[in-house]
């Protein structure tokens, strides 16, 4: 059974791409066959977070336009058996792809026998969002415990429901317990109360994420990382 999971946020800079990479790696480490799809056309980043930027030959738009076969564009991550990346086009804009084409692409990936297709959704609610959610079976919404990020997440949850995707899982990213205790940061309960969705996981603010991301090695692979442990738990809950 194949499943397409879109990772979205509304607000940029909350850790959506990092979350996508960690979920994808986490699933692959559990023995699953996974494709990470970067749907942020014109602003691709997932390849850098995964440390695969030097191996790109073809991209998502090349596949859709028939310049290459899907199999040619998929980059196998040699560190994790069963993990592949389909990068976004860097020199095109989001209008190069339609929701129908994205839906067909997801089906074609499913037909190749992949168990999970993780789509890294661009920030915002325009064409890129519509494309990313078109083929999705369910959604993960990433937010940080800030008023502006939570408000944007609320808007995204409404738009997901309008697109037929209900009950998204919520990830609260970069939580600092010391700030919550001082009353300087929203608690997980505060966020949950506002958004009224199930919390899939809480990722603590952890400098390991910055270090591992810069190395192109997602935190989920780090045994002693607090964020890595959180991502491993999130992965198990998603399965």
Each language-model region and where it sits:
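Residue-level signature of catalytic and energy-coupling elements of molecular machines
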Residues: 12, 38, 46, 63, ...
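Conserved catalytic-core segment of NTP-binding enzymes
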Residues: 104, 110-112, 116, 121-205, ...
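Helical mechanochemical/support elements of P-loop NTPase systems and associated helical scaffolds
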Residues: 42, 56, 66, 70, ...
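Solvent-exposed alpha-helical segments within well-ordered globular domains of core cellular machineries
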Residues: 25, 58-62, 72, 100-107, ...
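NTP-binding/hydrolysis catalytic cores, primarily Walker-type P-loop NTPases
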Residues: 212-239
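Walker A/P-loop NTP-binding active-site region of P-loop NTPases
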Residues: 4-69, 116
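Conserved beta-strand scaffold positions in the cores of enzyme catalytic domains, especially
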Residues: 4, 85, 199-202
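P-loop/Walker-type NTP enzyme "switch/lid" segment
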Residues: 39-111, 210-215, 220
């Amino acid at each position: 059974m194949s499943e397409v999971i879109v990772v979205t946020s509304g607000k940029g800079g909350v850790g959506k791409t990092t979350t996508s990479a960690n979920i994808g790696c986490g699933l692959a480490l559990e023995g699953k066959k996974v494709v990470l799809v970067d749907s942020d056309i014109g602003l691709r980043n997932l390849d850098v977070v995964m440390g695969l930027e030097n191996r790109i030959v073809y991209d998502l738009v090349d596949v859709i336009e028939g310049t290459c076969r899907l199999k040619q564009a998929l980059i196998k991550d040699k560190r994790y058996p069963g993990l592949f990346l389909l990068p976004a086009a860097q020199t095109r804009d989001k209008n190069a792809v339609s929701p129908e084409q994205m839906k067909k692409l997801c089906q074609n990936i499913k037909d190749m026998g992949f168990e999970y297709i993780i789509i890294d959704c661009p920030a915002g609610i325009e064409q890129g969002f519509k494309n990313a959610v078109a083929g999705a079976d369910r959604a993960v919404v990433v937010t940080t415990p800030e008023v502006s990020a939570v408000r944007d997440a609320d808007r995204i949850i409404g738009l997901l429901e309008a697109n037929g995707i209900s009950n998204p899982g919520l990830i609260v990213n970069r939580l600092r317990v010391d700030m919550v205790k001082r009353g300087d940061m929203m608690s997980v309960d505060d966020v949950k109360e506002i958004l009224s969705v199930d919390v899939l996981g809480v990722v603590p603010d952890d400098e390991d994420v910055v270090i591992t991301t810069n190395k192109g090695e997602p935190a989920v692979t780090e045994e002693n990382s607090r964020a890595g442990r959180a991502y491993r738990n999130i992965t198990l809950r998603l399965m």
